[in-house]
């Protein structure tokens, strides 16, 4: 493996981590939005706050990681994507800011009306953010981002591959969140809520799975390079995604919630990995390969050292934080 590919692999590990951890975070907004009235949805919204409260900002570590690696290791392609896809990126950024602010402000609202307003903003921004990030991925994967950065500001992300990418991003986030929330509700003894979420998570999973595989048809015409990769070297990952998704549905149906979470993570990670492997060796599809887009060798070597240090310094505290959130320890009065 060349150093350029090694750095690209490290970059894509961050994308997978953000898709899984940030995705479960974003997806909670879908269930918040569809929870119902203030009284009817109170129990579910409390569960959402309890589940994502300790980690909702920690998940953005992976987005920062991806951006830093990308602009440092592959600066020209980064500049090209930021220029051509500036509109969906700005909308995604707006969603992230609104989501974070409204999540915090809702807790300190003085009136029910304010709480409802911030709740709607939180839920809506939880949907638009992954949608626009998905359109960015679709624009890159369909070869609509020229290296010169002169791509069309609208058609680069308003196209079949991008729109399906956005819908798939929202669906996978909701599916992950539903699976995680079901397990949290069951662990905390909320059996009725767990059963309600179980049915909704099953529905979201079926719809999302159907959309993922339906997208293969327009992608075949709209993004032929990606389609060839998905039908070739990435085919095992496509099959794994299907099997893991099906296993998640079966496990949810049988109320095996802890194992279902692992299967859901495998399913989503396989979908995202399939995209990366499918467009390899291109960084910007049909424009520039990973090797040709890479920066100076010294920079790449320093980045790999930085990644190794980050694994040692950042991953253990994050793992401990996530372990705490999967128990009731952090809610005890002495914590």
Segments from the language model and where they lie:
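Membrane-interface helix-loop-helix modules in multi-pass inner-membrane proteins
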Residues: 55-126, 225-232
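Short, membrane-exposed interhelical loops at transmembrane-helix boundaries
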Residues: 284-303
């Amino acid at each position: 493996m060349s150093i350029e590919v090694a750095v690209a692999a490290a970059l894509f590990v961050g994308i997978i981590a953000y898709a899984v951890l940030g995705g479960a975070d974003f997806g909670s907004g879908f269930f918040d939005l569809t929870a119902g009235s203030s009284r009817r949805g109170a129990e579910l919204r409390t569960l959402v706050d309890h589940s994502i409260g300790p980690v909702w900002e920690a998940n953005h570590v992976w987005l920062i990681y991806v951006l830093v690696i990308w602009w440092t290791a592959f600066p020209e392609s980064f500049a090209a994507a930021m220029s051509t896809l500036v509109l969906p990126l700005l909308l995604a950024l707006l969603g992230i800011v609104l989501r974070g602010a409204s999540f915090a402000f809702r807790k300190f609202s003085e009136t029910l009306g304010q709480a409802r307003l911030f709740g709607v903003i939180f839920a809506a921004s939880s949907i638009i953010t992954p949608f626009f990030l998905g359109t960015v991925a679709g624009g890159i994967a369909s070869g609509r981002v020229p290296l010169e950065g002169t791509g069309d500001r609208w058609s680069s992300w308003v196209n079949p591959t991008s729109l399906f990418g956005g819908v798939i991003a929202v669906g996978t986030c909701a599916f992950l969140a539903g699976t995680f929330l079901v397990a949290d509700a069951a662990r905390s003894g909320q059996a009725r809520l767990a059963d309600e979420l179980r049915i909704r998570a099953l529905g979201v999973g079926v719809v999302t799975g159907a959309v993922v595989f339906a997208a293969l048809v327009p992608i075949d015409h709209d993004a032929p390079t990606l389609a060839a990769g998905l039908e070739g070297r990435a085919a095992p990952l496509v099959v794994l995604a299907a099997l893991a998704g099906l296993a998640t549905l079966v496990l949810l149906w049988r109320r095996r919630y802890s194992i279902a979470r692992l299967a859901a993570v495998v399913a989503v990670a396989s979908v995202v990995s399939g995209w990366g492997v499918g467009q390899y060796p291109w960084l910007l599809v049909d424009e520039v390969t990973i090797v040709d887009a890479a920066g100076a060798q010294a920079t790449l070597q320093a980045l790999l050292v930085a990644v190794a240090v980050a694994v040692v310094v950042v991953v253990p505290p994050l793992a401990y934080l996530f372990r705490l959130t999967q128990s009731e320890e952090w809610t005890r009065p002495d914590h």
